[in-house]
Amino acid sequence: MLGKRTGSRHIAVVLLMCLFWYVISSSNNVIGKMVLNEFPFPMTVTLVQLCSITLYSGPFFNLWRIRKYQDIPRPYYYRLIVPLALGKLLASVTSHISLWKVPVSYAHTVKATMPLFTVVLTRVFFGEKQPTLVYLSLLPIITGVGIATVTEISFDMMGLISALISTMGFSMQNIFSKKVLKDTNIHHLRLLHLLGKLSLFIFLPLWLYMDSFAVFRHTAIKNLDYRVIALLFADGVLNWLQNIIAFSVLSLVTPLTYAVASASKRIFVIAVSLLILGNPVTWVNCVGMTLAIVGVLCYNRAKQLTRGREQPTLPLSQTSYVKYSPLEQQADPYYRGSVNGKLSNGLHRTPGNSLLANGSGMPSGTATRLLFV
């Protein structure tokens, strides 16, 4: 059954999920900042989040009947999956370092430079050139981040560098995750779980060597400070939920609408952090933040205009869908992990009617991307 998700019920679902996404994301950032203020171990906070992804995803994804893993050829696994896990690890650690060193509002303003990194990296890795309009749309982003940096009262060089490295890492993940999803048709949530497990496996020895002894000597751990432990637990759960909700929103709307929603989310996070954490800002600093976010919206609009075709706005997303229940009656070769339809390169092809809810098939022309932010 084909159709456009244009009804008022669908609009209400999208708006409700976006609101939930904004609240979860802002809560995650505020709690993360509170944790790092009292427990200054960004590597340990990263470890908790990776553990959360690893521990919660398997049982819940099975409960939700998310399609099982597909076989990925070992050479492909080492060539793309392992580097993706390393990139996720680097981006997560540096993101927490930036959150530790600078205010949430400034860290998220710097993260507005992601389109700049995306343009540069796609040119470096794939030789992809952008139209002049797209390059021009980057100027407000650069200008806004520059103004915010110069006027940031709590500026820290390590915080700035870490935020930039983190943004570059997330941008690389977005680019190469799209390739993995296209090549393997692995469910996007299963890819999140796979990267979380692999990142944890790589990171655990490093954490044991660099952070574990200092952590166990910290007063919060020695004295079993339940407030810090509860904040760490909440941070891990909220980070996991944020990823799940972000991917769910992406499945319901067009890529352009998702990009606009993501930019709006950043505004919400900045506003909430300023309200709750109360870090001092000047009006010029606010102008810089606003200009950077507006630049992101201009970039998204420029990308839309240069595609040469109209994209629907919220939440018109041309989507193929089938009735969810009963799942057992559907002839889905991936149900409960069965696999067929191998491609010539050893990877798998997803049936055309496979859902994002119980498969990862997206209609042709519908871009799918992971956003680990």
Swiss-Prot record:
A GO cellular-component term linked to this record: Golgi apparatus
Name assigned to this protein: Solute carrier family 35 member E1 homolog
Annotated organism of origin: Drosophila melanogaster
InterPro entries: Sugar_P_trans_dom, TPT_transporter
GO molecular function list: antiporter activity; transmembrane transporter activity
Family named by the database record: Belongs to the TPT transporter family. SLC35E subfamily.
Known role: Putative transporter.
UniProt subcellular location: Membrane
